[in-house]
Design a protein with these regions (language model features):
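N-terminal, Lys/Arg-enriched amphipathic/low-complexity engagement segments
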Residues: 1-35
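Active-site helix-to-loop segments that bind/position phosphate- or nucleotide-bearing substrates
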Residues: 2-5, 11-12, 24, 64, ...
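A broad, structure-centric signal for solvent-exposed, well-ordered loop/edge residues
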Residues: 23, 30, 44-46, 54, ...
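Glycine/small-residue-rich interface belts in oligomeric ring/scaffold proteins
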Residues: 34-90
Length: 301
């Protein structure tokens, strides 16, 4: 079942009521209004309003159900997320396998990750009517551990093609459509972290990204092949270029990405579900039950 995504952009209160998530706010007549949501139906929650109160009991329940909770800052951009300590009954077995992974295994997994990312970047360019052959050739040449830094070479060419004649450079604080890319990537990161935790893996122990100040190294690794899905949505719509700050309409569009269909293995499924499939296949790789991480691809047009 596809989990629901909820967006809370108005003042109010979130609390737990009879094992349901309850949202209480006031209407134009200052009368109290309340809505409830079954926790088992939820997969993703965005808390945007700075005047939103959330109870501790509510946060505990959301963490227990492994529901991704993203908190936004004063600029309405994602700034933090709720990370449960445990989300899988086999967590110890999976975590031990992850921590025992050899450098050779991690290098092989990173090669697969970079290859999948570049392949999806090439498909993104093709869908936008841009030249993609160079990236397809580059994807086939990625070495273990990406020792030749094919990821960076691909990124440079990729964003040059996406930008075209416009003076665009990819940076966190840059001009549009950077805000849309930042928002979309942050949503992806939270979704991937949720899936990894749900599979009993440690987000802090990456296969490539390793930084003592980054508790989401593995999420940053595994989300890489998913980035082109955000890119394709952003660069195919001029709405994300028009304004320096994202409005509710643009944010709603980006959140719809989680329900967009992709090809995962041999099946067509929503992106959010495919992230869980990728996470599960990564676990099997750590357990030495499989040798290839299953990343999603674009649905062919």
């Amino acid at each position: 079942m596809l989990k629901r995504t909820l967006f809370f952009g108005s003042p109010g209160r979130l609390f737990l009521e009879h094992s349901l998530l309850a949202y209480e706010t006031r209407n134009a007549n200052d009368a109290s209004e309340k809505r409830t949501f079954p926790l088992e139906d939820l997969g993703f929650i965005i808390l945007e309003s700075l005047q939103l109160a959330v109870t501790t009991a509510c946060l505990n329940a959301l963490a227990k159900e492994n529901i991704a909770v993203v908190v936004c800052d004063h600029a309405h951009m994602p700034s933090a997320m709720l990370q449960p300590f445990s989300g899988n009954t086999l967590a110890q077995r999976h975590t031990e396998a992850q921590l025992r992974a050899t450098e050779a295994l991690k290098a092989r997994l990173w090669r697969q990750t970079v290859k999948a990312k570049i392949t999806n970047q090439a498909e993104c360019l093709k869908r936008l009517g841009l030249p993609d052959r160079r990236l397809r050739v580059l994807a086939e040449s990625v070495k273990a551990g990406d020792s030749d830094n094919a990821e960076a070479v691909a990124a440079r060419y990729y964003f040059q093609q996406l930008a075209g004649p416009e003076a665009f450079s990819r940076c966190r604080d840059g001009i549009p459509p950077n805000p849309a890319l930042n928002y979309g990537y942050a949503i992806l990161r939270a979704a991937v972290a949720r899936a990894l935790t749900g599979s009993g893996l440690l987000c802090v122990a990456g296969i490539h990204h390793s930084n003592q100040y980054n508790p989401f190294g593995l999420a940053d690794d595994i989300m890489e092949p998913f980035r082109p899905f955000v890119d394709e949505m952003v660069f195919s719509s001029r709405d994300f270029f028009a304004v320096p700050e994202l409005g509710k309409v643009q944010k709603a569009q980006l959140l719809q990405l989680l329900t967009a269909d992709v090809i995962s293995g041999t099946e067509r499924r929503p992106l959010l579900n495919s992230i869980s499939c990728t996470s599960a296949s990564l676990v099997r790789c750590f357990l030495r039950e499989e040798t290839v991480v299953k990343y999603p691809e674009f649905v062919k047009k």
